[in-house]
Amino acid sequence: FVKMNHSIADAAALAIFTPAGIIVHTGDFKIDYTPVFGDAADLQRFAELGKKGVLALMCDSTNAIRPGFTQSEKTVGKTFDAIFAEHKNNRIIVATFASNVDRVQQIINSSNKYGRKVVVEGRSMVMFISPKASK
């Protein structure tokens, strides 16, 4: 397993060693040098695999064909802080994927920082943030 970053916790790529050669399967990933939680992707390990020779690379990254780069997820947290600071007396409704636990945590952090209540809707969201989910 090779450490990767993505919107889900514990994302990893697989390096599969076969008699014919090394096959690398990344799954969907995002290179984030300053992730909200956890370590950055293990690019050193990818370099080591490359030096050994990779027979096939199967990878997927959202917006990979779009020029430029995607900012760190930490940028989103700063944006939430700015929104909460600007709208102290207004209701704020945020929609996100329940599986994007880094983003959900940043929403909760900003809510707490500005003394706001968090109301969770949706079965998946409730399941992901419930204390029971960690058991």
Where are these regions (language model features)?
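His/Asp/Glu-rich metal-coordinating catalytic cores
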Residues: 1-135
